[in-house]
Amino acid sequence: MAFDLAARLAERRAADLYRQRPLLESPQGPEVVVDGQRLLAFCSNDYLGLANHPEVISAWQAGAERWGVGGGASHLVVGHSTPHHQVEEALAELTGRPRALLFSTGYMANLGAITALVGQGDTVLQDRLNHASLLDGGLLSGARFNRYLHNDSASLASRLDKAVGNTLVVTDGVFSMDGDLADLPALADVARGRGAWLMVDDAHGLGTLGAQGGGIVEHFGLGVADVPVLIGTLGKACGTAGAFVAGSEDLIEALVQFARPYIYTTSQPPALACATLKSLELLRRETWRREHLAALIRQFREGAQQIGLQLMDSPTPIQPIVIGDSAQALRLSRMLRERGLLVTAIRPPTVPAGSARLRVTLSAAHSEAQVQLLLNALAECYPQLENADA
């Protein structure tokens, strides 16, 4: 029987769920050129405005001159260069952990950590709103896999009572589509009380949370005993690319031995690691970036409340505006684009059915005036959706 791909694609179009790739024709930044149109963007994860920072660019260029442009081999053959090792040491210091291990992508870090730690006869428990890479890792591990209610430590506790073997509890730190924080103190307490390990994917918290930018674990004042497995990505607040796992000496050595996505892939370009070293330096040194970002978040939330927008409970740069209907979310996104603003509509299956939204993301590179432009446009466009539904 032939694959009927055309029917699957037609079904997705009919449900207003068809995805398309905008063509970015400029560097990352608040002002971009997309599909030939100059726009003010509020949809990038470049939270600290480092993706196009001149010092980071210069570090990449110098790294390419010194180390070339290719990793050449896997880390376990001859691909683990000095810059890679230096980044791992810097990440261990930033997160307050003995060791860190560099991965090429966040997806690979999550799959590698979960599948190396649990397997048949074990249990993995995950928040129902976790990122797809975490859910895929749980399914691929072969362990008993179950999901607890979102951010609900009581729901987790009831599932832990039925767990078998080594048990890994997995949660996002900042939930990427809602922007809310995992209740790590409560989750860690429940996990430790039942002998389970807690793994946190802090993709959206690293750099934006904590006094030093160490992320959600620093934000809550927790340590390795509370969160034995910490994941972070480098393509968001750090502005470069890649990911890492941070934890104990034994954890990192176990991943080197058993994490297949780490073992069986070519290392990232050493010059990229040089750029990341510079971005980590800026992340820690230029604390004004987090301070300015926090001020923009307050400005947006106060302005959105005055307009009557339905926001999530988010203290982070991720500020979703819940619309509900996918077609209406697309319509609002189009109206904003007609006014020179780029805000992406997020639809199922990325978010639950009936919860389509505009995912506004703020950056330290934005100005207060630019955020006000967005609020003004939303004040003009959002009531038109309400009128259309009346």
UniProtKB/Swiss-Prot annotation:
The molecular function terms in GO held by this entry are: 8-amino-7-oxononanoate synthase activity; pyridoxal phosphate binding
Organism listed in the record: Pseudomonas putida (strain GB-1)
Enumerate the residues binding pyridoxal 5'-phosphate.
Answer: 106-107, 176, 204, 233
Look at the named UniProt entry and state the broad enzyme category this protein falls under: transferase
Summarize the subunit comment. Answer: Homodimer.
Q: Which UniProt keywords apply?
A: Biotin biosynthesis, Pyridoxal phosphate, Transferase
Q: Which Gene3D superfamilies match?
A: Aspartate Aminotransferase, domain 1, Type I PLP-dependent aspartate aminotransferase-like (Major domain)
The family this protein is said to belong to: Belongs to the class-II pyridoxal-phosphate-dependent aminotransferase family. BioF subfamily.
Query: Where in the sequence is N6-(pyridoxal phosphate)lysine found?
Result: 236
Function, as annotated, reads: Catalyzes the decarboxylative condensation of pimeloyl-[acyl-carrier protein] and L-alanine to produce 8-amino-7-oxononanoate (AON), [acyl-carrier protein], and carbon dioxide.
Names of the cofactor(s):
pyridoxal 5'-phosphate
Q: Look up keyword Transferase and say if it applies.
A: yes
Give the gene name: bioF
- Name of the molecule in the record: 8-amino-7-oxononanoate synthase
Its annotated pathway reads: Cofactor biosynthesis; biotin biosynthesis
Show the catalytic activity. Answer: 6-carboxyhexanoyl-[ACP] + L-alanine + H(+) = (8S)-8-amino-7-oxononanoate + holo-[ACP] + CO2
